[in-house]
UniProtKB/Swiss-Prot annotation:
Predominant place of localization: secreted
Keyword Secreted: yes
Keyword Chloroplast: no
N-terminal signal peptide: none
GO-annotated cellular components: extracellular region
Cellular localisation: Secreted
Name of this chain's protein: Brevinin-2Ef
Function noted in UniProt: Shows antibacterial activity against representative Gram-negative and Gram-positive bacterial species, and hemolytic activity.
Cysteine disulfide links: C27-C33
Length: 33
């Protein structure tokens, strides 16, 4: 249903945000930004 779709969208968006945060953090830590 609609709720399931929204939940899946939220999960996907959350994963994307987490991944970009991790990438930024590791890039800054390694000084490769």
């Amino acid at each position: 249903g609609i709720m399931d779709t929204l939940k899946n969208l939220a999960k996907t968006a959350g994963k994307g945000a987490l991944q970009s945060l991790v990438k930024m953090a590791s890039c800054k830590l390694s000084g490769q930004c």
